[in-house]
Amino acid sequence: LMKEFADNDDMPLAGGVPTAPTGYNTDWFNEILNTAPVTEHNITANFGSDKGSSLLSLNYLDQNGIIGEDASFYKRFSTRLNSSYSINDFLSVGANVNYAYIENSGVATGINGYNPISYAYNIDPTTPVYDENSNDTFGYGVSPVPYSRMWNPIAFMDEAPKNKNITQQFFGNVYAEITFIKDLVFRTDFGINHRNFRGRMFAPKFFHSAECKEDNSRVEQSTNANSSWQWENTLRYKKSFGE
């Protein structure tokens, strides 16, 4: 139907490719989607005595994306430590510490329909994934339908910008409680939250058609770090009367 529309409307053709029957019947969703396995490991250890206890946990998650194959993934390593101990009758201490390392990468999805899913919906099945006779488009098949959004989804994923990000985050708190007398308790609590981000984007130059091209390669890098802390001190007195 899309081919007939282009023929009947007598519009200029994308890349100059004729709208004659091609003999192809490409399943574009089958071409762009892939199985995305998920691997996750968890280890938890508990330690304790009559003075207190600690819990240490480790987690590793590795998930591939359903689009982009090796170019799309999410990896995370995280650890957590919770502990509380009574030093003596009037002093107790504790800590809650968390750390995470995240690495993720993916094919740029863009906005306003400029992404592989949108292209797979819109491109006609008569376009082949690859065209060995088309050296000027790097061997990718070009749709005969004259619309800028008729981008070959495989070409888009191969040539579109690739993003790779690394995020590290540390947050936690340590505290101490001092019991001066039976009903009077002082607590000091110090917490911190630190996040560090590094991102990199690479967009290669390419020519897919007159409407789908990038004349220059681009590299963008960004870094961001922020920290915050909070220190709380409270004095609590609790007394019951009339019991």
Put a short name on every predicted segment.
Residues 1, 38-40, 53:
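A beta-strand signature from Gram-negative outer-membrane beta-barrel systems
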Residues 33-35, 45-49:
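Outer-membrane beta-barrel initiation region
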Residues 38, 49-50, 86-90, 179-181, ...:
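Outer-membrane beta-barrel channels and translocator barrels
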Residues 42-46, 82, 173-175, 179, ...:
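Outer-membrane beta-barrel architecture
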Residues 184:
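An active-site-proximal structural segment forming one wall of the substrate-binding cleft
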Residues 25-36:
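Periplasmic N-terminal accessory/gating domains of Gram-negative outer-membrane beta-barrel systems
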Residues 1-25, 61, 65-169, 187-243:
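Surface-exposed loop/interface segments of Gram-negative outer-membrane beta-barrel transport/assembly proteins
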